[in-house]
Regions:
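Short beta-strand/loop motif that positions the catalytic acidic residue
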Residues: 433, 439-441
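N-terminal cap/lid segment of alpha/beta-hydrolase-fold proteins
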Residues: 93-97, 206-251
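C-terminal catalytic histidine-bearing segment of alpha/beta-hydrolase fold enzymes
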Residues: 447-450, 454-496
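Hydrolase active-site cap/lid region
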Residues: 360-412, 468, 476-479
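Glycine-biased, low-complexity coil/linker segments
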Residues: 71-72
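Cap/lid segment of the alpha/beta-hydrolase catalytic domain
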Residues: 266-327, 339, 388-391, 395
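Alpha/beta-hydrolase fold nucleophile elbow
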Residues: 343-356
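Short beta-strand element of the alpha/beta-hydrolase
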Residues: 243-245, 253-263
Length: 496
């Protein structure tokens, strides 16, 4: 039970039950149901007993009589495991982490226990261009600290990874320094029929009517935002895109934001905050399944039918899993364009697409393929520069041609697979973009190497904003998230 929601909910607010109606068939209320006070009529009002029960629960919580665990199944408040007492930090001597080719990079390594340097710490370190370490050594830090130097003669990222061995356990820390990053060039080659392939894919997808459906979610709606679970057809009959739609309750024409997901299988909640800023928000899933089920439902799929879906169909551009994912993103914009619900519709000119990791790639692809997109945000974009590893340069997730165990390119890559993946390389989409974009990523990212993220930024067309956060790995800081959203809002509100 969401007690915060109970606190914020007006006691006299009418709550609505779910009711499914096709998009475009909106009525005077968000559900399309008939006004009334019985549940069967579509509405009910909390009775006196319910109100008293909520009030009692709040009082009991304040008094500490009721409590809920932070983790586990037992009662009471429990402490949680957060971090480790042993830490390994690696810090460059340039505050911006940026160096020129051939310049000496000086790293300071500290191993600490309870915040103080740990004398006699045994470490193993490796360093070199990211994904391709050239030096591996063991040493003892008599006073818990040391300085290690290196250099790189070509543009890229130079990484020092340190593993401390303490009491039979290993603790890691690393740092990737940027070396003339503005000169990084991706290796991705582009098929001659790239544009024709995608134009045909989108055209064929649109042979299938959208047939959208919308389901009002009263428990996720507020006085300012109506929230819906929606779906619409993708590239063939029966294959639907499911999403969470947030729209302002006030009728009018609004800019729109399409949120595209990172890798995985999960439910979605939408973006109430962004919607409250005066925007339509559509957050889509990519697997053709509803996005409001319990997490266990998605975990089962992720470990079975959808396990490693990013490897499905690599041998054939028409069988590649991401083909219907990308057409689904285009159909999502088709849905936004035709949206009319309770007097709310898209303004027809301001539309952003954004996401991180896999979602960063999908942002690049959608923007490149759909001229209705007016701006985009790509944060640590994955699936960029697949074949870079074949030239011993860091490649993007999911590292199709890189042997992570051996830290080298895979043996005997299939030339056909190399060719087919070029149709799904974020670099080839970025080169075709002409509208403003926001890029952000971390230099310490082990999933999406910054070499690929920076190289993709370097070749992207249009006006672009770069905001790296060097210390981040495959995550973002609150300040980074706030900046990202502020940039999107500024772009969407430029042309009211």
């Amino acid at each position: 039970m969401d007690f915060d929601a109970l606190e914020k909910q007006p006691q006299n607010r009418t709550r609505r039950v779910r009711h499914v109606v096709p998009v475009g068939y909106g009525t005077s209320n968000p559900t399309g149901a008939v006004e009334g006070h019985r549940v069967g009529a579509g509405f009910y009002k909390p009775n006196k007993t319910e109100k008293e029960m909520k009030r009692l629960l709040r009082i009991l919580l304040l008094l500490g009589i009721l409590s809920f665990p932070f983790r586990g199944t037992g009662g009471g408040l429990q402490a949680q495991i957060i971090g480790t007492n042993i830490t390994v930090t690696v810090t460059p001597d340039h505050k911006d982490w940026v160096y020129k080719t051939g310049e000496t990079i000086t790293f300071t390594v500290d191993v600490r226990k309870s915040g103080t340097l740990l004398d006699g710490a045994n470490i193993t370190y490796e360093m070199g261009p990211e994904l391709y370490p050239e030096v591996k050594k063991d040493m003892v830090l008599k006073e818990g600290t040391t300085v290690i130097k290196g250099k790189m003669t070509k543009p890229g990222f130079y990484k020092l990874k340190v593993t401390a061995h303490v009491a039979g356990k290993d603790y890691e820390g690393w740092c990737s320094a940027a070396v003339s990053p503005e000169q990084i060039q991706p290796t991705a080659q582009c098929p001659k029929d790239f544009d024709a392939f995608w134009a045909k894919a989108i055209e064929e997808a649109r042979w299938t009517a959208l047939e959208p459906h919308i389901e009002f979610l009263p428990e996720r709606s507020t006085p300012d935002v109506n929230t819906y679970h929606v779906s619409f057809q993708n590239d063939r009959w029966g294959r639907r895109v499911y999403a969470i739609l947030n729209v302002p309750t006030k009728p009018g024409k609004y800019p729109a934001l399409l949120r595209v997901p990172g890798a995985g299988v999960r439910p979605y909640t939408g973006d109430e905050w962004f919607c409250k800023q005066g925007c339509i928000v559509l957050e889509i899933g990519i697997h053709g399944i509803p996005v409001t089920n319990p997490q266990a439902y998605y975990d089962n799929l992720y470990s079975a039918a959808l396990a490693g879906y990013w490897h499905h169909g690599l041998h054939d551009r028409n069988e590649n899993y991401y083909k219907h994912v990308i057409t689904g993103c285009i159909r999502a914009i088709d849905f936004i364009e035709t949206l009319q619900t309770n007097g709310v519709e898209w303004d027809g000119q301001n539309l952003a697409v954004t996401g991180s990791s896999q979602g960063g790639f999908l942002s690049l692809a959608t923007t490149a393929l759909d001229k209705r997109v007016s701006c985009y945000g790509a944060v640590h974009a994955a699936l960029c520069d697949h074949e870079a590893s074949l030239k011993r340069q860091a490649c993007g997730w999911p590292h199709y041609f890189y042997d992570e165990g051996q830290q080298r390119p895979i043996d005997h890559p299939d030339p056909n697979v190399v060719e087919q993946t070029r149709y799904y390389d974020g670099v080839n989409f970025a080169r075709r973009i002409t509208v403003p974009g926001y890029f952000s990523f971390g230099y310490n990212d082990n999933v999406v190497p910054p070499t690929t993220a920076y190289g993709t930024y370097n070749v992207a067309g249009g006006d672009k904003t770069l905001s790296p956060y060097p210390k981040t790995a495959h995550f973002w800081y609150q300040e980074q998230w706030d900046e990202w959203n502020a940039w999107l809002l500024q772009q969407l509100k430029k042309n009211p």
